């Protein structure tokens, strides 16, 4: 429901009601002051000096009158604020009821209207408790997406926003949602007033962390429901009352359908973050059901997406009210990636890929680096291999248990240096501080995936970072697709003499170590399956791969025998986009993230 904004007239009426007789006395006194300034023109004999003296006197009276009014107003406002605080405190002490309680109408809420785009958070007229949370997070100045989205969201508009990753959009939707909960004085017994839907567990956890910081000084409750977590514990918390809920689509739908005592009839705000990614990973049906179950009356919806697709537009139609505000902060930019990002590629034969990666990581031990691979088994193998040869790395992929993924993610976030090897599970939305390098060891599925991968570095308004993509000679056609997507890349040159040649030692190790050999075979098999499911098959043709060279990149002297078919059936199969974990592939050759 749109939250109306105060006009000058409504503010005046409120002031009359608030101050009662005092306000009327002030209005009655105002004409007298005006009359004192304007002298009758009929008295022509009054000298110029007298007129000047009278004007000076009247001005002085007017200033004194205004200052006394301000003092009186400030006194009354402080008294009113004190009574409001006492009332809020007594409300917070009430015990929550399990069956949920209707909220009073939101029609009385008034939020400040801004003249022009504000620059600092202090200009938004936010509540003192929210401002304390923002200051505690160390923010003062807003990013462009925050300047353009927060004011209309505070005014109750539905918003469809397009912004690059790293633009600061998380605060753009959290601040209005929290202000709404605070203004309506949500309590546990009122149930859930705001829901944030996120495509991945890691992104949901990150949003939840920012929610915790922003709500540190508020009395409203908050919680998170994600796949892989304890469902019973989540249900118990929902029944007690969670005012702001962060969720992944599958688990949210589960609770909406099956958790009795989950009160969401008072929902006022629905936020869909990374909508394109939610749909890409196979949650289209879940989102349609969620939109149908949640109450739409009096609901404000915010939908954010880095890219605009037909499916995103369809989701917007069923979830947003007619006439939403569309905000695109990227259309005026020359490039699709953030400024401050130096992007390059290196052309490298398949048998030299690991040697180059190993040499690069060895030379940059003091840097913070993320390496993207195409499958879970590849991540698992290279993580085990590098740690075994004393090059410490962390690994993150969809086959890990949720607790392991969470621990790894936060360990890397808090580290000042180190390497994280991961699948695209970490490529969307996650805000990992101070990443120096993004290494795309396995090429992305398309330019959109490239943009989201490199979005992990150079984040924020003044962020700096570098990106390096490995390409085989047969894959240089991908550069044309990047150029069409307005992605500026230049070729990086790595002198051959600086590449550490450990191929013979690697092959010997893989030949002798049973567990590494088994892991290498699984990684090799998954790499080929992922390559075969590329959507850009004109560029990434699995039949053009030199399997001898590819196998050397996994530590084999000759290609191992593996159970896989890459026959002619793929030639006739229409291109299929990559699917991520959480989806249900229906074909024999599943998805590029076959084991995500």
UniProtKB/Swiss-Prot annotation:
| Region of interest called Disordered, as start-end residue ranges on this chain | 1-119, 565-596
Give GO BP annotations, semicolon-separated. maturation of LSU-rRNA from tricistronic rRNA transcript (SSU-rRNA, 5.8S rRNA, LSU-rRNA); maturation of SSU-rRNA from tricistronic rRNA transcript (SSU-rRNA, 5.8S rRNA, LSU-rRNA); snoRNA release from pre-rRNA
Location of this chain's protein in the cell: Nucleus, Nucleolus
Report which residue ranges the record marks as coiled coil: 42-95
Q: Which positions are annotated as binding ATP?
A: 163-170
Which reactions are catalysed by this chain? Answer: ATP + H2O = ADP + phosphate + H(+)
Would I find Coiled coil among this entry's keywords? yes
Compositionally biased intervals (Basic and acidic residues)? 40-50, 61-76
Identify the InterPro entries for this entry. DDX18/Has1_DEADc, DEAD/DEAH_box_helicase_dom, Helicase_ATP-bd, Helicase_C-like, P-loop_NTPase, RNA-helicase_DEAD-box_CS, RNA_helicase_DEAD_Q_motif, SPB4-like_CTE
Per UniProt, residues of the Helicase C-terminal domain are: 340-510
Task: Write down a Pfam family by its short name.
Answer: CTE_SPB4
Which residues belong to any copy of the Helicase ATP-binding domain? 150-326
Compositional bias per record (Acidic residues), positions renumbered to this chain: 77-94
Family of the protein in this entry? Belongs to the DEAD box helicase family. DDX18/HAS1 subfamily.
Q: How is the quaternary structure described?
A: Associates in the nucleolus with the 60S and pre-60S ribosomal subunits.
Name assigned to this protein: ATP-dependent RNA helicase has1
List the lineage, top down. Answer: Eukaryota, Fungi, Dikarya, Ascomycota, Pezizomycotina
